[in-house]
């Protein structure tokens, strides 16, 4: 149990730092769409799709790696709370179109990235 807790802790910290670095680098590039948050959510969605595909096929992987990558890293990297706050900020500024676009791009993009990764990595592990 302690190993699993440490895996979540280490993965979560690493994912959070990665999200912060993405936000610092890419959020200033566009005034209405926080590109760093979007990148974090899309990358995290892809990684979790890849992880679930691999873990469903490769049942001998240590559970520590599973929670480190999915619950830990992807949980720290992706962010629904920051995304929600950024949408509310856009709404408060009266930028309703940008807020709606932000919602659609984050949600649909994340679903698409998870599905793509799951499909790609399920196909690659069937050999």
UniProtKB/Swiss-Prot annotation:
One of its GO terms (cellular component) is plasma membrane. The chain crosses the membrane at residues 4-24, 35-55, 71-91, 103-123. It catalyses: fluoride(in) = fluoride(out). Belongs to the fluoride channel Fluc/FEX (TC 1.A.43) family. This is Fluoride-specific ion channel FluC. It is found in: Cell inner membrane. The keyword Transcription does not apply. The keyword rRNA processing does not apply. Fluoride-specific ion channel. Important for reducing fluoride concentration in the cell, thus reducing its toxicity. Its main location: membrane. Coiled coil: none annotated. It comes from the Bacteria. The lineage of its organism: Bacteria, Pseudomonadati, Pseudomonadota, Gammaproteobacteria, Enterobacterales.
């Amino acid at each position: 149990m302690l190993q699993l807790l440490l895996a979540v802790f280490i993965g979560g910290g690493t994912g959070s730092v990665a999200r912060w670095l993405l936000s610092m680098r890419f959020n200033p590039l566009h005034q209405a769409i926080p590109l760093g948050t979007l990148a974090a959510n899309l990358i995290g969605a892809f990684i979790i799709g890849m992880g679930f595909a691999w873990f469903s096929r490769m049942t001998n992987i240590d559970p520590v790696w599973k929670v480190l990558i999915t619950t830990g890293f992807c949980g720290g990297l992706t962010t629904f709370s920051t995304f929600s706050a950024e949408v509310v900020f856009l709404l408060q500024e009266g930028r309703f179109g940008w807020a709606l676009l932000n919602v659609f791009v984050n949600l649909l993009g994340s679903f698409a990235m998870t599905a793509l990764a799951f499909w790609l990595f399920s196909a690659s592990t069937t050999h």
